[in-house]
């Protein structure tokens, strides 16, 4: 996979993600399922979900790879998108793997992620990470990503 574009800012993360989903030909009720770490990935998942809120898809959050714990992602007035009630079903047309899954010390293995992806052979696979996490963890070659959004949060400036 080669880098095609270099964008910046939050819109540089969200616009290509939304464009990809629009081009994927998803219909009403098709699921975009985000797999990520509770707490750290969740805010980014809700931000991605907000960017695509006008598409006719269902959005689902799966903590780590525990599909039995899947939660729906729904709009909340004057807030944005929020992880909410149990999802009821997990049947992704698009799997979104968050980079937190590839970080050292996370209680999920690459093999467990590979198994959940393999359980949905018809699903497209998108990766969203920061600071080249998929490349550093060797996931770029291990997963058949259709799109990777790799953003940088560097430098971080603190003003006091």
Model-derived features: positions:
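Glycine-rich, aromatic-bearing surface loops/beta-hairpins
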Residues: 85-90, 94, 98-160
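Long, charge-dense
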Residues: 44-104
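Short glycine-rich or small-residue beta-strand-to-loop segments that form or flank ligand, phosphate
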Residues: 30-38, 62-63, 94-101, 126-127
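Short, charged/polar "capping" segments at the starts of alpha-helices
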Residues: 41-42, 69-70, 132-137
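Secondary-structure boundary elements
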Residues: 23-28, 55, 118-122
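Short, glycine-rich nucleotide/cofactor-binding loops
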Residues: 6-13, 36-41, 101-104
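Short N-terminal or domain-adjacent regulatory/targeting segments
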Residues: 1-29
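N-terminal interaction modules that seed assembly of large macromolecular complexes
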Residues: 28-53
